[in-house]
């Protein structure tokens, strides 16, 4: 089990203690936003969480879970790309629509949107998939970004 730096403990406490449902943790790159989120999960004793992130970050999440979680945690990590979205044929005017996979359309104790700046365009299909179809049913939504817009 790795130990957090003092500044990371402050961020983790802020995530865990905040009363707001939506939070943005916007530390600079490399300061350990993943570790802070996992420490907050420990404090809140969350047993299951959904992470939506770039494909390259998925393996990092699984590695960090091993290092930082103290409670049993089922972490579901999906990339912004096709691993969490399905393409469905629509009308002749529009060749396809993008929706989250059906298994993601359920209540979640926690949704973490890692590198949330990738969802800055509210009209993009992946932003709409996350913010309209998944986030409304999550008890908590934590957006993590080292590049806030």
Residue map of PLM features:
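Short aromatic/hydrophobic "clamp" motif used to bind/position activated sugar donors
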Residues: 141
């Amino acid at each position: 089990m790795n130990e957090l730096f003092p500044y990371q403990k402050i961020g983790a406490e802020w995530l865990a203690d905040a009363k707001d449902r939506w939070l943005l943790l916007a530390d600079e790159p490399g300061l350990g936003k993943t570790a802070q989120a996992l420490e907050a999960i420990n404090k809140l004793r969350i047993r299951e969480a959904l992470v939506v992130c770039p494909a390259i970050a998925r393996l990092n999440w699984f590695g960090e879970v091993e290092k930082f979680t103290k409670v049993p945690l089922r972490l579901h990590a999906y990339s912004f790309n096709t691993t969490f979205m399905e393409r469905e044929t629509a009308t002749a005017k529009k060749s396809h629509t993008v929706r989250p996979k059906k298994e993601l359309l359920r209540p979640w104790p926690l949704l973490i949107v890692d590198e949330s700046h990738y969802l800055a365009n509210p009209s993009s299909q992946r932003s709409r998939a996350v913010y309209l179809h998944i986030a409304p049913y999550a008890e908590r939504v934590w957006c993590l970004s080292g590049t806030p817009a």
